[in-house]
Amino acid sequence: MSRSSAGFADFFPTAPSVIQQKRYQATRERQRSRPHLSREHADEEQIVTGSRTSGETVNGNSPQNLGQELRSDLNKSRKEVAEDGSASHGEANTPANNTSGPGTGSSNDTRLDTLTPLTNTESSPQNNPSPSQAKAPNGDEPDGFRQARANVSNSTMTPLHTPPTPTTHSLSQRVAIVKGSKLVHDPDRAPSKDKRKRPCYVDIVSDEQEGRLSDPRLSIQNYTRGAGCRQKTKYRPAPYVLRHWPYDPASTVGPGPPVQIVVTGFDPLTPLAPISTLFSSFGEIAEINNRTDPDTGRFLGICSVKYKDSASFHGSGPVSASLAAKNAFHECKKGQRIGNNRIKVEYDRDGQTSEKLASRAIAAQRIDSKIDMPVVGEPKSEAQVNKNEPPPTAPKGPSGRSFMRPSAVIPEGPRASFQKPAIPSLIEETPILNQIKRDPYIFIAHCYVPVLSSTLPHLKKRLKAFNWKDIRCDRTGYYIIFENSRRGEEETERCYKFCHMKLLFTYIMNMESQPYGNPHYERSPSPERMKQEQRQKAETERLKKEAELDIEEEKKQRALDLDPCTEVLAIVIKDLRDKLLEDVKSRIAAPALYDYLDPERHASRRKQLGIPDPEGIKRPMFRLDFDSRDSTPDPHAKFLNKRHPSGVSGLNILSALPRIRKAHRLDRTDVAFLDERRKQPLRRRNVRPLYHRLQQLHDAEDSDEEQHTPLSRDTDDQDSRPPSRIGSETESEDADEDAAEALDNSTERLDNEDRHSEIGDLEAAVQDYSPSRKRKRTSESPSHRKKQKESDDFSAVGEGTRTDDIPQVLDGVHKGTVSQGLSDSADESSRLDHNKVLLEELVEDIKTTHSEEPGIKTHHVQVRQSAENMVEGAEYGEAARHEVEWRVSNDEPRPIVDDDDSVVMDLDGWQDVVKDEEDLQFLRNILEKQPMSVIGNLSAWAWRQKEIKALNRPGDVGPTRQAASIEGYYVPNITGAARTEGRKRILESEKSKYLPHRIKVQKAREEREAKAKSDPQNAAAEAARIAAAKTISKSTSRSTRVNNRRLIADINAQKQALPSQGGDSDVLRFNQLKKRKKPVRFARSAIHNWGLYAEVNISANEMIIEYVGEKVRQQVADMRERRYLKSGIGSSYLFRIDENTVIDATKRGGIARFINHSCTPNCTAKIIKVDGSKRIVIYALRDIERDEELTYDYKFEREWDSDDRIPCLCGSAGCKGFLN
């Protein structure tokens, strides 16, 4: 094409105007290429529309009703044609019938199923009109419509004898598809309201080409190249290829990329070394396994390689296991060889691939070994022998054995045996049912279809119409296995429905359907469930083992803690409980009953009822006496009234709680604890029943010996008794009982010893009576014996000088003594008041009546001194425990108990303060609003509190009056709290007063100073020892010298071995500095903060450690020191080397900076030059033992006139007091 003929569209094919013109031309071509059928349909629609829109009236009908009448007539004519179709069907196929007029009986003009050029005889059946072709109700057809329809039919109908169009061509051109129906007449909406008419429907017909949708963008030329519209997105028919996301273990739930590969294709005889060399070039191998046959040990030519993560691989960066496996897989796909064979590599994520390959290789070797095995001397089976015999039902001919002779056997030479390879049997030996898990299957038992290998292919062909996955068989039958999905289950049911009980050759397939897999299969638990069960099992086993260990430990602990004393204590407690119940019955219940049955209490009642008084009243063996301030009832008041006419009667004026006391020696339960030197009491008479004891009568003239058990006093002195057997109340009770027995027998039998022993009891009671109204009974044996001796002296002096008025006073005293012995501890204070009054009266009478007798005066002085001593002892014992005084005050209201405010309110303090239920209720009321604290077991908490108190205050038991604290540890603050004091620096001298380790050093120092003052000789010896310690660095031991000589010899040998260089000495000295370092550690120091301690024994003059830090100039060191002080760093570690250089180890340094100062140090600091630089090294001044703190002298310049001197805290014997 020349340049002149080329146009704008040729040079610019993508211009918008050119594209628009091409689009217009393509649209016109599509319109021209439309099929002729559309035009024909258009003509038909035009004809029908023209007939419907004509304004003529047929049979008087309006134009609106014309269409409805035409449709009715058309339906009527079609019905008539259908009735006469059988008679006219044979004639309709001839040309004469096609040209017959309307007057004949032909119905060609009304047949609508006549073939057209677009249909054939196979398109659709005849005489099947649609619902829209029903007969009209009136049976008439308009002439105009019949004429038009005839014209249309004549122009469009084609006779049957016309050569038909080929079927394939007509189907490819147009295929009619009925999409649905359209309602054209609805009787419900018609204006005629004629409900007899039926609704009319018209089919909606469309062809395949019209129903097929096409992409309108494809009609645009070069649309895929972006020529349609440059502003729109380019059409991309292929999907995008996205980048593969790398594996991230933090956000990935599933398994990670494979780290194991399996290699095949190499020679099985290839050694493992070349395989390992090849695959180790991709990454670090964790495991390599060349598979072998487990039976024969032959290599299978299958090798699995597993990689692991490596931090550094061949000097490069880290390589992960998955990346190594990936590189090996892609590299080996390019054709890697091992030897002369090309290998094949596959991923093996879980080892399943290698297992499958190994199992296949092993099975193939088994088959090859069976084929290659020669058959020698194998007996023929019975089936082979009888293979050529006729069937058993065949007729038998005459026997010819008698006429047959054995033919001679012709010898044959050796010949090769050509054996066909045995076909592997398709019948599996392993049961298939156990291998099927959840796969749907159909089972055919072997009893219905015999299990043969040849039957399996025929069964597969028989079931080829179904989508099965595999068909397998074993000795039990056939298994038709489908895929494990919903579709597989449906296919299983469909196969069972169509093939169950059907024939397979001559057998019937009796099937058993299992659409949900093996019903007896138990699903293995998931990994999470297995891990959970394993964890639970491990936890249960652990708890069980711990319980068993606890039981064994408890058994061992019980065996160790088994104490016979504990068991004895339990037995004693049980016996005491039983004894207490017996005492309650005998001492409380029985006396209360006797008191209630006393006849005197019911005198008024007897008078009211007219009952006479009993003839005699016997006092029971139990005494229920009452003490009061004015009177003391006594059962033997008749003897006292004879001697005291003015004595008061035994009536109870002020009632109090009774004292219940058994008669003397009625209880023999404690005979084992009595002194064997005492006289044994006589055998008591039998006790009569209670009723007789209450009602028995006695004469006044009966002697006391008949009514009471004979008593005998103990004549042994109390000094002769063992002290351990004298109780706190035994003496007073014995004295009271002796006095009561003496009064029972006769008042005349009282001698001087008894009277003066009663005076001693009264004096002891006076001593017990404290001004604070709190009593503490003190019955100490030595004091009591001392008082008895004084009473004996008083009796000896004043025996011949007494007058008759003394017995009167003594009777009153005796009356108080008896009351003292018979009354209970609850009213002991009132008894003491009464006895005090009697004692004062007795002393005054003695003073006034016998003032001229020196013996009595002497005894009075002794009594007063003894009373003062007892009062002091009582006051001292009173402080130990405050007891409640349950009685009525006589002179003024007094508190029951006086609380001591100095008692520390810990657990023991609260137990001492709370006396009764009332105090406990008050305490509950106070603590109601306080929040409740959880303390767990109350007994354990109380025991723990008392154990803490015992640790803090050893030896203190019970209430204390001083809190547990360390003297000087808690420093008071002016503002009340350390937080409100603000920030201030605490001096080291103050820290030494309250820090525990400083207090320890301070105490050691004070003890040393006190010892030096008390013993000057030891002080001088200590000073000499300190002086020797200072000079010990000048001399060394023999072993140290030997070690030093050996070290020097080693250094000289190293010098000779090294080449001659100028810096050898510095290098050797630096090596010495590193080699000779001693093991040390830092810990809390008693001198100051942290300290350095030796971990081994260090000899004198040995190097210990180097003082390491940052080397700075003097000006920088001064600036840093000021900065450290401003920032609050209390300790700065600056060590001066020379005038211009300072080592700063405050923030950058070794542990040598923790060495503290001491006025008598065990180390020293030396400056040596190593490698041209000065170093600070710490040496030992003397032999240092293990765990001893290292110290050296800081050697600060002495500042005599300075006000800010640094105190020394070393605490040594030669301490100077200050560092500067």
UniProtKB/Swiss-Prot annotation:
Biased composition (Basic and acidic residues): 26-44, 70-82, 183-193, 520-542, 697-722, 746-759
Family annotation (InterPro entries): COMPASS_Set1_N-SET, Nucleotide-bd_a/b_plait_sf, Post-SET_dom, RBD_domain_sf, Set1-like, Set1_fungi, SET_assoc, SET_dom
A molecular function (GO) term: histone H3K4 methyltransferase activity
Gene3D superfamilies recorded: 3.30.70.330, SET domain
Record region (Disordered): 1-147, 179-198, 374-416, 516-542, 697-811
Ranges of biased composition (kind: Low complexity): 123-133
Motif placement: RxxxRR motif: 1041-1046
EC number, UniProt record: 2.1.1.354
Cellular compartments annotated: Nucleus; Chromosome
SMART domains per the UniProt record, alphabetical: N-SET, PostSET, SET
Post-SET domain span: 1204-1220
Biological process, per Gene Ontology: methylation
Binding site for S-adenosyl-L-methionine: Y1194
PANTHER family assigned: HISTONE-LYSINE N-METHYLTRANSFERASE SETD1
Subunit record text: Component of the Set1C/COMPASS complex.
Name this polypeptide is given: Histone-lysine N-methyltransferase, H3 lysine-4 specific
